[in-house]
A protein has these predicted regions:
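Non-catalytic C-terminal interaction segments of nucleic acid-processing enzymes
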Residues: 1-44, 57-160
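Conserved catalytic cores of phosphodiester-cleaving nucleases, focusing on short active-site segments
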Residues: 47-53
Length: 160
């Protein structure tokens, strides 16, 4: 049985459906504190997925918490860990390019809120500087997308 390590800081009420998808696909989940990210395969600790619940959370991480987020990516790089940020959003955001057309809901109340084009540029720069990938999925597909990404990385690195 393949084991997925799930970070203990993942909130139980947010991951019920994800864990059901893991179980249905016959993956065992073990909760443990991870150095970086939220998910990894037990057999491949050098690839992690950092799950974000939506673009609003991702925007907060890379804008308001920019230094902390960069420090986490640098720590991963220093340890040889590849990070993939998986952002749960709607069907309108399927790629990094699509982020350009995102309309930040905070713009209604704050004209200085981050726009989609700006967020795209920040994510692209982080991708270049820290070799981080940004992937997107619908909320109902998160568990399956995590499995797909973990398996693909394992195959690319000769793990499976």
């Amino acid at each position: 049985m393949i084991v997925i390590i799930q970070d203990t800081r993942e909130k139980p009420n947010a991951i019920g459906k994800i864990n059901r998808q893991f179980e249905e696909a016959e993956y065992k989940v073990v909760r443990s504190k991870l150095i970086v990210g939220d998910y990894q395969l037990l057999e491949n600790p050098l690839f992690v997925i950092d799950r974000k619940q939506d673009l609003q959370e991702l925007c907060g991480n890379v804008c308001q918490q920019h230094q902390r987020f960069k420090a986490e990516l640098k720590r991963a790089n220093d340890l040889g860990i590849k990070v993939c940020v998986l952002c749960e959003h709607g069907s309108d955001i399927q790629s990094l390019e699509d982020v350009k057309k995102w309309v930040n809901p905070r713009l209604k109340n704050s004209p200085k809120a981050t726009k989609g084009e700006t967020l795209f540029k920040i994510l692209q720069t982080l991708s270049w500087n820290y070799d981080v990938d940004f992937k997107f999925c619908k909320k109902g597909e998160t568990g399956l997308k995590i499995i797909e990404l973990l398996e693909r990385c394992g195959e690319e690195n000769g793990e499976r």
